[in-house]
Amino acid sequence: MRRAAATRPADADGFNLQYTQGVGSFSTFDEFLRLTYGNDRWQTSTRVVYSSSPNDFKYRNYDKNVLILDDDHNIERNKSGAYHDFHALQEVYYNTGHGDRFGLQAWYVNSKRGLPMLSVDHKENDDYLNQQREQTLRSILSWDHLRKKWKVGVKAGYIHTWMAYDYERELGNGKMEKMIRSRSTINTFFGQVDGEYYLGEKWLFTATVSAHQHLVRSIDKNIIPMDNQQPTDPNGNKTKVPVGYDKGRIELSGYVSIRYRPTERLGLSIGLREEMFGSEWTPIIPAFFTDYLISKRGNLVAKASISRNYRFPSLNDLYFLPGGNPDLKKEHGFTYDAGLSFATGRDGVYTLRGEATWFDSYIDNWIVWLPTAKGFWTPKNVKEVHAYGVEVKAGLDVQLAKDWQLSADGNFSWTPSINHGDPVDWYDKAIGKQLVYIPEFSASVTGHLTYRSWRFTYKWCYYSERFTTSDNDMKTKIGRVKPYFMSDISLEKAFSFRWADLSLKGVINNLFNEEYQSVLSRPMPRLNYEIFLDIRPKWGKRNKKQ
């Protein structure tokens, strides 16, 4: 359930309440509560989400008994995959009625998640801990000032994150050995000012200035220095000393853009950005955009853009424990794209929309996070990357009959991402190969069929094979993650009573019981279900009518 992730509540009139209870396979429970109040001046929203599950689904382990030629592989349970996630989001907005709007947002997250045991881990005992915990508070104060031809927005905020990663194993002596005890604290203070100014109907000027102060402390309490450097306590006993990083960095960003529409059909825009990370400045980063209305019939529009890219490694990229890489280089390159879009239809009958985009990027020192054999991920630079391809999107809404509606949305992507870096050695086979974990082909379709208070949904997605080694080796089982198709369905029925609106929804995930992995050696659940009950009392509406 991701509804708490939204950053702005829907406008409310009076008091409203919504409660959703979900129950699913593997003893999975989801709960969602929303309280809202609104009038002409005030809008408030309180949202709470709690999700938990042992996540101990069964799977067939093809990575054990590899010499077996039939299908008699072990059936095992997903170990160390339990999770508990709590989210609370509070928002308050006040409108003065004279063009000023003040806002307060506070979002708290408390999460505890196990990292499942790899299917190639052959230890039989369950004395194992691989767990990540997180507590995060995000708070933002905002002010928006709106006038007929211009507007100004100001934001200031604070983000605090505490993260812990623990890895423990029983090594055969009956005792749990603490191998990793990573602790990270991140504090960020930020401010942002943005503005827009309209000059007539043809010109729009925008500007944004932002500043972030990051403070990161990341240590591993379990790392001990070498013997000749290891300190001792007053009794002469060697002590453990945490090893890690305590870093701070200020980041500044400035962006200005000019948009010009000389005719009804043609639009032009240019943007300039410059950023500072610590004591390093990026060069001026330009971007150019244009769009042209080819035909009003069907609203056929051609679009194109060219932009320069520049990205410094974040402090997490550099120093997070475990996995941070302090040797990362900054990423930079150019991106080009062009495409067509259209939208047509008949009122009350159908609407059809679609777009196709070609893109081409040349990136040096691409920063990518990759999984390691130790169970965590780490970032690396890929010296030269050529990423290009085509993305196609389409949507259709049809009124089939008086009470019948059909809608569908789909997309298809062809995204080669080729490593063109210099070989480390003359025999390096990674040059000219697809980057790891990036599928060359992917697609998805979502369809809805509605009849009065009934709603049926079908979701389908496809991912082509993803390579796990830089040379795209397919001779071994660990060289790739196999392609897979996925289908999910749901059926929802809405009920309207005098005292409340209710809906009951049943979901079947992985309808065809597909065996698949998203990450090498991490099996995913097969066919599973969820049931949701949604309740929305009408007391506010009933009182208003009375």
Language-model-derived ranges and their functions:
Residues 37-130:
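Periplasmic-side early beta-strands and strand-to-turn transitions of outer-membrane beta-barrels
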Residues 202-204, 210-214, 229-231, 236-361:
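Structural signature of Gram-negative outer-membrane beta-barrels, strongest in the C-terminal barrel
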